[in-house]
């Protein structure tokens, strides 16, 4: 690695540690020529799939566009930055795990909506209104009803799970 101060090609690594939750390595370096110290970061350069848009065009996946869309949806809502970043990491992980070279942007949009549904209902409806191109109030009503049904099903499944777990404990103690 060349020194950013004097351009010398001989630098020595003085310290290495994990950074960015294990996604990168942070290295402290010292130039053997001028003695200046500097920090470098090393991370895997993974190519994410290209997105196939609704209009048939293709474009590279851009994590910043994903982040901007989610942040716009959660704006002025009680959602932490950490929760947003975790959602973005899960979406990017799913993209990488797909192994596809091209990916339908509509599937990506559904993943974003799924993450937002778990983060904040208002953010979910905001995103859905743009993503699904709502034209009138009725479209909002239908989406809210769909959200309520999905949440109701999840709540019922969770309650059933608790009942079954509780029932098995009762049976074991008899």
From Swiss-Prot:
Known role: Negatively regulates transcription of bacterial ribonucleotide reductase nrd genes and operons by binding to NrdR-boxes.
Cofactor, how bound (note): Binds 1 zinc ion.
Residues annotated as domain ATP-cone: 49-139
Cofactor: Zn(2+)
GO molecular function: ATP binding; DNA binding; zinc ion binding
NCBIfam families: transcriptional regulator NrdR
Pfam families linked: ATP-cone (PF03477), Zn_ribbon_NrdR (PF22811)
Zinc fingers typed unnamed, residue spans: 3-34
Stored InterPro entries: ATP-cone_dom, NrdR-like_N, RNR_NrdR-like
Family: Belongs to the NrdR family.
Assigned keywords, A-Z: ATP-binding, DNA-binding, Metal-binding, Nucleotide-binding, Repressor, Transcription, Transcription regulation, Zinc, Zinc-finger
Gene Ontology biological process: negative regulation of DNA-templated transcription
Name under which the protein is recorded: Transcriptional repressor NrdR
Source organism per UniProt: Nitrosococcus oceani (strain ATCC 19707 / BCRC 17464 / JCM 30415 / NCIMB 11848 / C-107)
